[in-house]
Structures are given as C-alpha cells and as structure tokens.
C-alpha cells in the first residue's frame, strides 16, 4: 500500500494457519500503514478481519497463536517467520506498548482487577511507572475525549455496552501508542458516541497516530480513510481509496453494510392484526428500579429519597422511573436511547433477572414477582447484548438443544433445534465449537437458542451488533417470522434504520423514562 511516509507497521502474510490442522485463514495479504493515516479493513462475517487485527496487535502471536509464513514489521523492526520452531517470539506486553488494540469484545481489554473507571484507565499508566500528577491529568483528558467524566467513579461492571466500549478505547489510547487497531469500534455506540469517536479518530490521525479500523459497516469517518482493504476468505478482494471502490463494481462491497443503502431488507413491518385487540403478552405497570449506595439493586418496597434529576439526594441511582409498557402478541417494538439510559436494565426485568423496586411486571397476564427466573424463562426468551454470556456447550447443535429434551422430549427437541439453526442460517455449523465461530455467528447462534423455545415474549438486546448485510437479513427474517407466529418482540438497538424498518413502533428511553419516538 503506497504512502508518502515510511510505514510504522507492515505485514506480509503469505499464509497464517491455526494449530487445528485446518487450511489457511489468511493468505496472500500485504498491509502497510503510515503515521498519521487511517486504514479501514472491511469484510463480511468470517472474512478474516478479526484474525488479521489480533495478529497485527500481538494478541495472536505467531507460534503460540498459529503458524505464520511471512513477516511482521513494527517501528522499523522486521520479524521474519517461516512457520517453524526457529521463528522469533513476540512479547505481547512489549508489542502492546506500541500497538493499542480494542477487540470486538470490549470487556476483554479490561484488567478486571480495578474497581472504578478511573482506576481502569490508569492501569496501563501505572504499569509504565507514570507519575501520579501526569497520570491524573491523562485520565481526566482521556475521560473527557470519550464522554466518561461523569462515570469515573463507577464500577466497570455497571457500565452499559456502549460505555464499556468507550472505556476500552480509552484504555487503548491513554498511553499514546503510535498504532491503534480497533475491531468494530462503533458497535453498541449511540449516535452521539459514534460522532465523538469519529472526532477522536480524526484527532489521533492528525496527531500522527496510525489508525486501523476493522468493520463490516461503512459510515462516517471510514469514508474519510486513506485506504480501504476489502477481505474475503482471508485474502485481499480489493484495495484502494474509498471513492475508487465505491465507484467500482458493486460486487466488491457485497455484504458490507452501508448506511446510505437504507434500512433493513424486509421493508416496513405490517401492523399485526392482534395489536390492541388481545391481552398484552408483556406488560409493565409503574416499574421503577435503582441501585443503593453499595451498588446492589434496591429491594422491592424500598423508599426513595427526594430525587434530583436521575439521582437521589443520597447518591442512590435511579435507572428506571415509572415505566408503563404493553406489548401485544405479534407486535415488534424497538427501544432506542443513549448509552447508559437503562435499556438493557429494562429488558432484564422481563424475565425476572432484575426485580423492580416498585411496580409490576406481567407476562401473559401473570405477575412474575416471586416466580423463579427459570420458570419465567419458558415464556420470555432473552438475547443478551454479549452472546458469549449464554454460550457454553461443545457444539452449536448441543447449544441450541440444551434443555429442550426435558421440556419437549427427544424427538421434538431435535426438530426444534434443527429448525432454529436453519432459521439463523447455521445448519452447516451444527457441529462447530461455538467459541470458534465469528462474533456475528455467535450472536445468531445465541438467537437460535432463544427461538428454539418459541417463547411468548422475545427480548433482544442489540441484536444487529457485528452483523454484516447477510447476517442482518437473517436476523430480520427470524424476527418477523417469530412475530408472525404470535411472539411479542422487544428489541433494544442503536441501529435507527433497522428500528424504523422492522418495528411497528419505536419508543425512546432516556433519563429512566419511556416516550414514543
């Protein structure tokens, strides 16, 4: 890739294979990125983007991580690899001082041993023996860049998905590495967060950082990149400037989502005939929820102190306030709102994972207070924002079938599991290890585990994250099919185009309150 400046990072990958005996996952691939430049690596699910990013970032070092035939070059030092025992070894810690990395799973970059956002940001600086005065200044500056100043005292475990991604980006840039690689950094961010991240990327590039963004979607700052590389099946399908590739054959960018392409492929969903004429499948009446000073959920019957905004006067945080919501069979409702608004918290009330401080949750007309979560889960299927939280079996088929034999018997369990895998396009992956699937397929697999039970209520937390165009079409078809069969669907999303297309109505959650959008 030609640049006017010498590259700060380069790679020539003749072949990269994992130790599982399979074929090459990357091959015939050359990458070079110069200081003060922005490169976008684009591709559909399974194209090799994440593998390339982890290899360049030192998170998948040749040798322990797999066999590389080719070279890696960083800040003028080239390491040659022949795929044998004589190859050099990369020290991930040393490499990481030069290359900041934000993985697709934002939580993986955190130390997990720090109790606040501020301490997590400072962790890398502490390891580099930065003085306290400089450390405090760097934490404040980085928090300001990423909209985290009001969250510096919060425990990372209580962050929303978008807030967690902002924190991961902050941890990667606070030490000012010359190279920054981010895998799907815009996932889970609200519109304001995406704009702020775009401004941050522009500022880093202007300051001389080499930025590489891996993405299955093109929008915003990626259109300003110096170069696009399009991957398919682990090799370069095309490369060039954004203008040149967008003006070329549509086949080059097939499957890569572009906002200008419009919303989802299914068109606007028809209003279900049952809406307003049947009893709600899900109903929330006056639901409020918050946390006590010690970070634990406030118990039912807890008396709130006088509120100031979204917080009580004694620092007990209120997340949901007086929520009234009814969703009928066959209805699709989208919930939007800024990061940290409480959208995931709202969904976790549907099956009793969280209990309201005040108010009532009814599923199919029955108050679920006091009912075990397991019994409610038969009627309420919840897709978590992070699909790995609900994947644990050895194969995709076992994952979907888990618990079905006991509920439906062996014959019906097998039929349901096979049908659910087919509904999300994963029949061919039935015997694959879930942990080895790309993030998009993990999300679809987690969805299949929910669909197989045919719940009365389907609650989906950020279901479009990490999906390419093909994956979005699969999701869209599955959601519409579930609604057509009578499920009440509630989906939380920052993908406003998809929300407008798929949902019968869209409601916004902000400052703990719901309003029709």
Regions found by a protein language model. Give the residues of each.
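H-loop/switch region of ABC-family ATPase nucleotide-binding domains
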Residues: 215-216, 493-494
